[in-house]
């Protein structure tokens, strides 16, 4: 039996709402007491209507937002208390493909630079030739051509931008992709 890659226990993400009558604080419960496990090699889906907390759940798992409560256990370690330095090693293992392809890519960077950035930051490719080859490989993995590397995000359709976001997530060869 495959071991757990990710285990989420009692995860909560509450946001303060306006104070009620007599100053009583109220909260919007975006994610409320969620439990699940993802085994290594498993594809796992969370389905729900718009606004039900799927994206918030993904951001909390990646610690892009700090959960209100619960455990996020990745490879047997609870990462909830990790500081930004410890999270760097986690981000090599876990990547997120953001929902909005228009907002998730820096408009001032070429696609080459967007895809090269995680490779350089995490030392996955060194030297211009190795970086260029890795960028081309990533573009091809998502069905795009080499020449797209020289273009900028505004030159692509929403679907193409989404594929660029996927390529960026794949750059670090993560164990878990949240999309």
Outline where the language-model segments fall.
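Hydrophobic anchor residue at the start of the ABC signature
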Residues: 166
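The feature captures the beta-strand-to-loop junction immediately N-terminal to the Walker
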Residues: 47-48
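Conserved ABC ATPase signature
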Residues: 152-156, 160
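Conserved catalytic motifs of ABC-family nucleotide-binding domains
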Residues: 173
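Conserved ABC transporter NBD signature motif
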Residues: 70-78, 90
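Helix-to-loop junction immediately C-terminal to a conserved catalytic motif
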Residues: 62
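Conserved ABC ATPase "signature" region
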Residues: 78, 129-147
């Amino acid at each position: 039996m495959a071991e757990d890659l990710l285990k989420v226990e009692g995860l909560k993400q509450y946001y303060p709402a306006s104070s009620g009558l007599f100053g009583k604080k109220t909260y919007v419960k975006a994610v409320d007491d969620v439990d699940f496990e993802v085994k290594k090699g498993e594809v796992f889906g969370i389905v729900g209507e718009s606004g039900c907390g799927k994206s918030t759940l993904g951001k909390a798992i990646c610690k892009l937002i700090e959960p209100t409560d619960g455990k996020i256990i990745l490879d047997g370690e609870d990462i909830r208390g990790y500081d930004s330095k410890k999270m760097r090693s986690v981000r090599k293992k876990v990547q997120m493909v953001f929902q909005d392809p228009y907002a998730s890519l820096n408009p001032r960077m070429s696609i080459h630079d967007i895809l090269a950035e995680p490779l350089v930051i995490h030392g996955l490719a060194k030297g211009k030739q190795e970086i260029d080859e890795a960028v081309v490989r990533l573009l091809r993995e998502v069905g795009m051509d080499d020449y797209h590397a020289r273009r900028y995000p505004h030159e692509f359709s929403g679907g193409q931008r989404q594929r660029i976001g996927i390529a960026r997530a794949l750059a670090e060869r993560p164990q878990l992709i949240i999309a």
